[in-house]
Amino acid sequence: MAARKNKKPTAEPARVSAKDLHVKGLKSEVQEQPISDTLKYNYMPYAMSVIISRAIPEIDGFKPSHRKLLYTMYQMHLLSGARTKSANIVGATMKLNPHGDAAIYDTMVRMSKGYGALLHPFVDSKGNFGKVYSRDMAWAASRYTEARLDGICGELFRDIDQDTVDFVDNYDGKLKEPSLLPTTFPNILVSANKGIAVGMASDICGFNLSEVCDTTIALMENPNHDILSTMLAPDLPTGGELIFDEKTLREIYDTGRGSFKVRAKWRYIPKQNVIEVYEIPYSTTTEAIVDKVVELVKQGKAKEISDIRDETDLSGLKLAIDLKRGSDPEKVMQKLFRLTPLLDSQSCNFNVLINGQPRVMGVRELLQEWITWRMDCVRRRLNWSIARKSEKLHLLQGL
């Protein structure tokens, strides 16, 4: 006879005692709760966390993720000397920023000179860091690239060890990090910054560093200074031609909200019958432009074009558009401006955290807030210096 298989005894379902029936969530029943309580205890903490700790820049021009990365690199003595592996920087940053390595590396890439998203990059990079104007150009892994702080970062950390800003605990309370960086120039208007929070967003376009500094000095001397006379227009990293009128720009400067058009720059090569596009709007990519032009050709809306190629190389961006014989390049470009992202809009929403409160401000109000904050940094530095000298004087008098 075949041996009988031993059947394992089945476990009896756990019994719920009478006293456990009063445990909330143990019984399958609908718990009624006013929607106001749900918003207060569930939605609001999440929304405020995203607004304050993630998406909206502060008066120094940085989000927390940017600040943690740059301060870590400063602590690694990367303001001078040789570059180090990006993976080394990412690993060290995790002591202040409890995110994955991919998120931290993405932050570093977007601040790098190689990526080209900022007028004045903070990370001096070496290796393939991709390009801001390319959607499909992937950057190399952190183990292959190297980085250090760019020279301009000396102005971000000047006097940081002289009590110019507050230091707070990191996420586990084992390290200290600055709540703000004591930037000696209005970085909030120099470095382009974009963030999407819960119920609000921020979109700050960059301006010329020299113009911003001149405007700040003029405002300190005369609070009624005409800002448009010294800050002529925004300055975008990818170039292009800005299309706006004075009324539109004044509205942006006064309210912190508005938009303007940005048009690609191009040239015509008669010998080759080719249009070369060498600067594009900041808000689009070369792939998006090529895809749209190809779509127009297939639909028969751009019959003058025989081919389009992305010839971007180490010398810079270049889109080559081959024209058919007898085509007028001016008319072709006017059509492409109308139907493709070669002409795009740039939105402005100057939403900044001031003392933990999000505020949409115009350029004048934003610079005045920066001046007030910077004066406080200088005052704290002087008080620190006086205290150190007083201690030294006390010791000398004791001798």
What are these regions (language model features)?
Residues 2-256, 318-320:
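Catalytic phosphate-handling regions of large nucleic-acid enzymes and associated NTPases
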Residues 2-17, 26-30, 34, 194-196, ...:
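C-terminal interaction appendages of subunits in large macromolecular complexes
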